[in-house]
């Protein structure tokens, strides 16, 4: 502090010289008094008090013994004490602030560079059970959580996943047995996760369309059975982590998985790819559109510091198996008729099954009962026609059902809004399995899919069985319908060009499986990482505030000490 060009030390030095002069005068006065008064008549200084209304001023401090000096001065500090005390405080403050600075610097840099400087990755683990309609698949993920985006180790691939059958939905009549179906999967997980990490490894069970189609009470009963088993697994599990996820979640997770594999997350949203999944029970369409869709179709997702505005929708009962079953029902109930001739009204013409296949009477009766066929529409036989064009037309009618209720500008499937597709897309699951069966490359066109389907549908059933001896009957039956359904869905409904290369039929990107569980664990970890910077900011704010409080406290203390010294008369206010 500088006053009138003089530093704090100048004031303290001037105060010290004044005090010494006054002290000498006081000593002389005391000596004179002691020679004039006898000991018995000396003034009792203890009882000396100023009288109220007295015209005499109170005694000067030099008239009092030293023990009274502290009671009549503010702080009673000796000359130079304020300066030395403040100096001592500053010598304490400077190392403290330096220590706080290095503490802040260490934690900031360690969070950014620890993964780079450490030769050994300290992996953490997470587990996701995909409880699908045909079976349950367990995925073990290894990851590190440094940076804005988690780093999931995808090198393990299939070695870190295992599938078991049947699916949880098959326990609808005996839900209490569902939990035991997970034993094999949990044993597999224990082999992959180190023992010391198991209690810290989060375990999620996410059921999809297979369980979504069941009654809510049955869903809860099946999940409760699974929860009991998962609680005893040795992994970190909470009851709410076993749930039936929505089709929207499933589509979003698949989109995250695809773009994580591409390395586009955390960058420009327009550079991301879209994804269309053809599952067994449902279809998911997810991508970042050019224009914002209606609010009910929009999801805002923050990943890597970037907010993505994603369109996603799940079409329940339009997955490959569910759609085929639904189409047969439409044929059996005459809701959909083909232009192909039939021998009689009791004969159903099936354009999606290769010619020569004969449906047994038991199968016809089962389907007639299931579909609620009336006696007037009693089915005597099913004629397998194997006609690609008619099958495609029937599939399109199925996809367009309910379009008359559309209230949006554009309804591509039923009465549901779908924006115009943009950018590249990945067609996964049954899209890929069908293209793989026909030996088509990932960049195949829909025209190639159509050509393969036409040839397959027209081939006799006996010839197909002879050519594909290693494939089961149920699988062979579906490929005529599958090719026609793919063209009806992607071209006739979503507007994908027949000869374009926009669609990539694959389940992998750079050997990374495009499984939605990868997206699910990525989103979960990103949410946890999003909370960590908030805690880091809170820590940094605490350090800053604490530093200012220490500085303020010492400065205030020095200020009060200086004022006390000045008010006591030790420091002259004028030179």
Question: Where do the model's predicted regions map?
Answer:
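Helical "lid/coupling" subdomains associated with nucleotide-phosphate turnover
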Residues: 2-38, 44-55, 80, 126, ...
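N-terminal Lys/Arg-rich, disordered targeting/topogenic segments
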Residues: 26, 48-86
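Helix-loop boundary elements of multi-pass alpha-helical membrane proteins
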Residues: 69-95, 123, 563-574
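Hydrophobic alpha-helical cores of multi-pass transmembrane domains in eukaryotic membrane proteins
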Residues: 96-103, 131, 548-552
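Membrane-embedded alpha-helices of multi-pass membrane proteins, especially ion channels
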Residues: 100-114, 136, 140, 553-561
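Membrane-lumen (extracellular) interface motif
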Residues: 107-121, 266-268, 563-564
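A short acidic Gly-Thr/Ser loop motif
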Residues: 121, 129-137, 276-282
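Beta-propeller domains
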Residues: 147-156
């Amino acid at each position: 502090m500088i006053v009138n060009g003089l530093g704090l030390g100048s004031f303290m030095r001037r105060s010290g010289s004044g005090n010494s002069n006054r002290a000498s005068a006081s000593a002389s006065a005391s000596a004179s008094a002691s020679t004039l008064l006898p000991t018995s008549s000396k003034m009792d200084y203890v009882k000396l008090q100023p009288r109220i209304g007295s015209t005499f001023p109170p005694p000067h401090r030099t008239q009092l013994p030293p023990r009274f000096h502290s009671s009549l001065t503010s702080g009673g500090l000796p000359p130079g004490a304020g300066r030395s005390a403040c100096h001592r405080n500053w010598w304490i403050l400077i190392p403290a602030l330096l220590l706080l600075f290095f503490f802040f610097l260490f934690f900031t840099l360690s969070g950014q560079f620890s993964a780079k400087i450490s030769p050994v990755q300290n992996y953490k683990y997470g587990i996701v059970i995909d409880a699908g309609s045909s079976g349950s698949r367990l995925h073990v993920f290894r990851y590190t959580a440094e940076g804005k985006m988690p780093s999931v180790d995808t090198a393990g691939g299939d070695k870190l996943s295992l599938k078991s059958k049947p699916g949880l939905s098959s326990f609808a009549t005996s839900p209490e047995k569902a939990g035991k179906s997970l034993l094999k999967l949990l044993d597999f997980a224990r082999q992959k996760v180190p023992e010391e990490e198991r209690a810290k490894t989060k375990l999620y069970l996410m059921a999809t369309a297979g369980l979504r189609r069941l009654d809510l009470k049955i869903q809860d009963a099946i999940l409760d059975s699974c929860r009991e088993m998962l609680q005893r697994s040795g992994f970190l599990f909470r009851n709410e982590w076993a749930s039936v996820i929505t089709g929207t979640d499933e589509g979003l997770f698949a989109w995250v998985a695809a773009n994580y594999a591409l390395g586009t997350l955390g960058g420009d949203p327009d550079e991301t790819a879209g994804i269309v999944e053809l599952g067994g029970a449902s279809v998911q369409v997810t991508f970042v559109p050019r224009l914002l869709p209606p609010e009910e179709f929009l999801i805002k997702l923050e990943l890597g510091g970037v907010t993505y505005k994603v369109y996603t929708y799940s079409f329940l009962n339009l997955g490959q198996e569910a759609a085929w079953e639904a189409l047969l029902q439409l044929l059996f109930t005459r809701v959909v008729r083909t232009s192909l001739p039939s021998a009689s009204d009791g004969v159903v013409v099936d354009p999606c099954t290769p010619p020569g296949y004969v449906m047994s009477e038991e199968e016809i009766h089962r389907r007639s009962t299931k579909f609620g066929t009336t006696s007037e529409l009693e089915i005597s036989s099913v004629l397998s026609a194997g006609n690609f064009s008619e099958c495609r037309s029937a599939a399109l009618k199925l996809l367009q059902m309910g379009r008359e209720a559309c209230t949006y500008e554009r309804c591509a499937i039923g009465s549901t809004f779908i924006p115009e597709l943009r950018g590249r897309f990945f067609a996964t699951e049954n899209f890929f399995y069908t293209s793989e069966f026909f030996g088509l490359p990932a960049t195949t066109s829909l025209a190639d899919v159509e050509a393969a389907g036409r040839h397959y549908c027209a081939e006799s059933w006996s010839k197909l069985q002879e050519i594909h001896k290693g494939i089961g009957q149920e699988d062979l039956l579906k490929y005529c319908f599958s090719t026609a359904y793919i063209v009806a869905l992607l071209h006739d409904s979503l507007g994908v060009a027949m000869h374009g290369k926009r669609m990539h039929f694959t389940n992998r990107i750079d050997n990374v499986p495009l499984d939605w569980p990868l997206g699910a664990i990525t989103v979960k970890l990103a949410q946890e990482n999003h909370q960590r910077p908030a805690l880091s900011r809170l820590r940094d704010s605490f350090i800053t505030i604490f530093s200012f409080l220490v500085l303020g406290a010492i400065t205030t203390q020095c200020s009060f000490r200086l004022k006390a010294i000045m008010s006591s008369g030790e420091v002259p206010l004028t030179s």
